[in-house]
């Protein structure tokens, strides 16, 4: 029986509000992964799955419980620990060689991931796909820009969930970066700057987009691997993107409910350019020329072993979000008056916490679009309730309401 059937059964029977599932755990083959199964059950989570199993699935979906008998728990923990231990570079290289031997004519990154069940982030753990293929004897050369792909994957793209954005990058790659940048729309220009900050941490590596594209166009191996990576990333996207609802939608490359890194957001909104990277590390950022104000919210501000510390930033429901200003903002201040009068166009970005539980990178922010103030009270900090012009998704509400659930 599939998980979808459980949900369908509950929906079709109005008087049935809960479901009990008994699953029997026995010995399993070494390559079988309980990790994947439990991650599918829990969905978005703030801690690694091994910790969840050991501590009783504290982040199971609201209203759900997962209970394991002690022996079953021991079997599952041993399985996950063994699976994680075995996922080293040498095993991956061996799997690549085996896959190439069998599927020489249709060899691809996506095909290999389906064949081996090795997680994508493990491919770029210590090397790149091209470097691993060379070690496996599949190819002779590696792109001199391989490190750029590794940086983009490990620092940016593992935290990004936006089909529209990755699709635009594929368009750049499909023309081998030999694009006429002079004809780019404002949307395409901003996507190109986002891409620049996916590859580089600092500004001023290139004077213009055309110079960057011309440089990348000379590296065929880079283009080949980048296309493989982007196609896989497109296929794995699950964010329920919608058209932007802000006053900037004519040029804004961000889509409602898409998930983006802070650097991507800053590039998309013009807070960062090729010449200047935004220095902001605060939770609020303004672009006065177009009356834009971006709010970056971590629902869980600090994570310590065995504890959860949250502040009063949380979703009250799918349409209203409770937010605390910075501590310095007091009643009667210039900032407070700007909020009261609605002087700026407020854009809300929310993530569960800063550090990603599975990858060594920062989590991405869900773009919740333009918001308007419903109420304000207090001082230093002020408490503001924002009304979302478009309700957040159920998946976002599940983590964005955590403070309300535990506070």
Enumerate the language-model features and the residues they cover.
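Conserved segment of the helicase C-terminal RecA-like domain
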Residues: 1-40
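Compact mixed alphabeta submodule
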Residues: 357-407
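Acidic, glycine-rich low-complexity segments with interspersed aromatic residues
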Residues: 133-138, 142-153, 157-169, 173-174, ...
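Short beta-alpha junction loops
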Residues: 24-29, 352-354, 375
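A short, structural micro-pattern
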Residues: 15-18, 342, 365, 378-380
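Charge-dense, extended regions
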Residues: 184-301
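Short, surface-exposed beta-strand/loop "edge" segments at domain boundaries and coil↔beta transitions
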Residues: 102-104, 119-122, 175-181, 203-206, ...
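Long, largely alpha-helical accessory region at the distal end of helicase-like NTP-driven motors
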Residues: 34-176
């Amino acid at each position: 029986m599939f998980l979808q059937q459980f949900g369908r059964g509950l929906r079709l029977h109005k008087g049935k509000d809960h479901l009990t599932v008994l699953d029997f755990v026995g010995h399993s083959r070494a390559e079988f992964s309980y990790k994947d199964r439990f991650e599918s059950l829990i969905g978005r989570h703030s801690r690694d799955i091994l910790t969840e199993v050991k501590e009783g699935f504290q982040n199971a979906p609201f209203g759900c419980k997962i209970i394991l008998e002690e022996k079953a728990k021991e079997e599952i923990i041993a399985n996950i620990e063994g699976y994680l231990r075995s996922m080293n570079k040498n095993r991956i290289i061996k799997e690549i060689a085996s896959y190439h031997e069998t599927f020489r004519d249709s060899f691809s990154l996506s095909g290999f991931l389906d064949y081996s069940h090795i997680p994508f982030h493990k491919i770029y753990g210590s090397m790149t796909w091209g470097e691993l293929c060379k070690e496996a004897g599949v190819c002779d050369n590696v792109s001199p820009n391989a490190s750029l792909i590794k940086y983009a994957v490990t620092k940016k793209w593992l935290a990004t969930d936006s089909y529209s954005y990755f699709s635009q990058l594929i368009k750049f790659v499909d023309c081998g970066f030999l694009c006429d940048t002079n004809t780019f729309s404002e949307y395409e220009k901003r996507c190109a700057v986002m891409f620049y900050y996916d590859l580089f941490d600092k500004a001023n590596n290139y004077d213009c987009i055309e110079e960057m594209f011309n440089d990348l166009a000379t590296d065929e191996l880079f283009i080949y691997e980048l296309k493989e990576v982007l196609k896989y990333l497109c296929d794995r996207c699950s964010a329920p993107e919608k058209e932007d609802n802000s006053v900037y939608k004519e040029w804004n490359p961000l889509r409602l409910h898409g998930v983006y890194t802070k650097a991507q957001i800053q590039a998309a909104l013009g807070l960062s350019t090729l010449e200047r990277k935004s220095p902001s590390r605060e939770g609020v950022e303004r672009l006065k020329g177009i009356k834009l104000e971006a709010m970056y919210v971590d629902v869980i501000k600090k994570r310590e072993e065995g504890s959860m510390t949250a502040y009063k930033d949380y979703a009250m429901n799918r349409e209203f979000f409770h937010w605390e200003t910075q501590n310095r903002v007091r009643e009667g201040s210039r900032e407070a008056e700007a909020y009261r009068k609605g002087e700026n166009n407020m854009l809300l970005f929310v993530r569960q916490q800063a550090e990603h539980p599975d990858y060594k990178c920062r989590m991405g922010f869900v773009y919740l679009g333009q918001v308007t103030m419903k109420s304000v009270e207090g001082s230093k900090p002020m408490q503001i309730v924002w009304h979302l012009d478009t309700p957040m998704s159920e998946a976002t509400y599940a983590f964005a309401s955590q403070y309300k659930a535990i506070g």
